[in-house]
């Protein structure tokens, strides 16, 4: 299965609590931190919820 790299580009400060919890659940802490996750429906849904805070790119 493909993998994706998720990078936190904007701060979750001032966002609604569910968006802040989603950022933490993705494993992102500080700005510009990145994680590599499996590309599946659950992760894609989380990315959609915070798409204005993160950038996503595919990893080969």
From Swiss-Prot:
Family, similarity comment: Belongs to the universal ribosomal protein uL30 family.
Keywords: Ribonucleoprotein, Ribosomal protein
One Pfam family of this chain: Ribosomal_L30
NCBIfam families: rpmD_bact (TIGR01308)
Gene transcribed to yield this protein: rpmD
InterPro entries linked: Ribo_uL30_ferredoxin-like_sf, Ribosomal_uL30_bac-type, Ribosomal_uL30_CS, Ribosomal_uL30_ferredoxin-like
GO terms for biological process, alphabetical: translation
Protein name stated in the entry: Large ribosomal subunit protein uL30
Source organism (scientific name): Streptococcus pneumoniae serotype 2 (strain D39 / NCTC 7466)
The UniProt record lists the keyword Metal-binding: no
PANTHER family: LARGE RIBOSOMAL SUBUNIT PROTEIN UL30M, MITOCHONDRIAL RIBOSOMAL PROTEIN L30
Gene Ontology terms for molecular function: structural constituent of ribosome
Cellular component per GO, a single term: cytosolic large ribosomal subunit
Subunit structure: Part of the 50S ribosomal subunit.
């Amino acid at each position: 299965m493909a993998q994706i790299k998720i990078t936190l580009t904007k701060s979750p400060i001032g966002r609604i609590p569910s968006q802040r919890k989603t950022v933490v659940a993705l494993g992102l802490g500080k700005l510009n931190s990145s994680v590599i996750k499996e590309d599946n429906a659950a992760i894609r849904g989380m990315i959609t919820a915070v798409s204005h805070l993160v950038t996503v790119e595919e990893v080969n």
